[in-house]
Structure formats: C-alpha cells, structure tokens
A protein has these predicted regions:
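Short, glycine-biased loop/turn motifs at secondary-structure junctions and
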Residues: 1-184, 188, 193, 197, ...
C-alpha cells in the first residue's frame, strides 16, 4: 500500500477540499458527520467526505451507514495503514480547540494530509511513533517498576517489528493486558493515557482525566504526539 496510491494529484485535491471545510468552520470534534444547515465533521469525517466530493459520490453522508468502517475506508482511499487513520482521529479529538496562536484542532486534518508524501510506504510509521511515545512514558513512570517493566516490554515488541521481525497476536495481547494495568498505576495521567493507547494498538483503551490539571496535561501530550507523527510522516518516502 502506497500513500495516495502514488498520486500527487489526489493529495492536492484532498488538501483543497479539507481547506474548504476548515475555512467554513466545518471541522469539529465529536462527530464523523452531521448536517444542521451546514455539514460538519471530525478529521476523519472531513477527509472521507472530501474524498467523496473528489469522486463525485456524496450521497447521504450523515447516516449511520456512512460512518461504518470509516477508518478502514480512509485507510484504503488514502493508501495509509489503518493504524494511522485511527491515530489521526485519536489525536484530533485530543488536541485543544485553540492555543496562543489561534485554532489548533481544526488545522490538524490539513497538517496530517500535507505531511504524507505520495508513494510513501508508511508501514513502519506507527511502530516508530509508538516507540517514541512509550519511551517518554518510561520517564514519566519514574520508580514505578511495574509500569517501567510493562512499557519496556511493549517497546521491545515494536522495535522487533521495526527491525523486520514477527510479533505474534498472543504477544500483543499479553503486552496489552500488562501495559493497561501499568498505565492505571502510572503517576502521570498524560503518560498513562499515552502508554495505554500505544500498548493497545490492537485493542480499545482510554484513560479518563481526573481533574482540570490532568486534562491540560493530556492536551499537551496530544500536541507532542501530533508533532511526532507529522515528523515521521514527512520522513517517510
């Protein structure tokens, strides 16, 4: 699978449509697509709707059927791994609405699409991203040996995959259980969320922020995640 199926034209058209949505304030969190006088949707919803517009296949983009398998459809149509389609969504929902320089979240779909080079093989972007995030989490975990051991175990699996080795489903499942448990015990809430998300690459897991300070820390962590992902995407040729 090659990004944009090797087509610079597809990338250009997608960026144009995403920017139309952004300038119309149509990129919002919490929904894949809704219509209340004007269509609005999240990063993934915006991207899929943009591709529908490009293909001339709008149809009914706000019903439940349209949202089914939306990450898989984005993966196939953009030529990117499914993990990255899900990660684009996760980061978008976690980013702050705005920052000192203006809006943050609404720019994310454009930044994500722009960072991807047509024809690039993005297979190893997710494992490399996960390793970066998890290594930060080791620092956050401090003296919590249970967390450090669990996180290092997941790092080892991802590094084996990056090196071309095979990681079995049983190994992923075991790592998921231990890392999720360790994440609950981690002292830093943002690290706990990041560790759980990376360890659960093949399962659903989310950690709730306990208070406003926790939520702010998580927003900061998601901003760092966004920067890491964009860097890895740009490096992939």
């Amino acid at each position: 699978m090659l990004a944009y199926h090797g087509s610079q034209s597809l990338k250009n058209k997608l960026l144009t449509q995403i920017e139309i949505h952004r300038k119309a304030d149509a990129i919002v969190a919490g929904t894949y697509g809704k219509l209340n006088g004007q269509w609005k949707g999240c990063a993934v919803g915006c991207s899929v709707r943009s591709l529908d517009i490009i293909d001339g296949k709008l149809g009914d983009c706000i019903n439940n059927a349209w949202a089914e398998n939306i990450h898989q459809r984005l993966s196939e149509r953009m030529g990117i791994p499914l993990e990255l389609a899900r990660l684009e969504d996760t980061i978008f929902e976690g980013l702050p609405e705005s920052g000192p320089k203006g809006k943050v979240r609404a720019h994310w779909p454009t930044q994500f699409a722009y960072a991807i080079n047509p024809g690039a093989d993005l297979t190893l972007v997710w494992p490399k991203f996960a390793v970066r995030m998890l290594k930060r989490c080791v620092g956050y975990a401090g003296s919590n040996e249970r967390s450090v051991t669990a996180i290092n175990g997941v790092i080892a699996l991802f590094e084996r995959r990056i090196a071309g080795g095979v990681v079995t489903l049983a190994e992923w499942q075991t790592a998921r259980v231990y890392a999720a448990a360790a994440a609950h015990a981690a002292a830093h809430a943002a690290a706990a969320h990041a560790a759980a998300h990376a360890a659960a690459a093949y399962a659903a897991y989310a950690a709730d922020a306990a208070d406003a300070a926790d939520a702010a820390a998580r927003k900061h962590e998601f901003a760092r995640m966004a920067d890491d992902l964009l860097e890895l995407l740009r490096e992939s040729k």
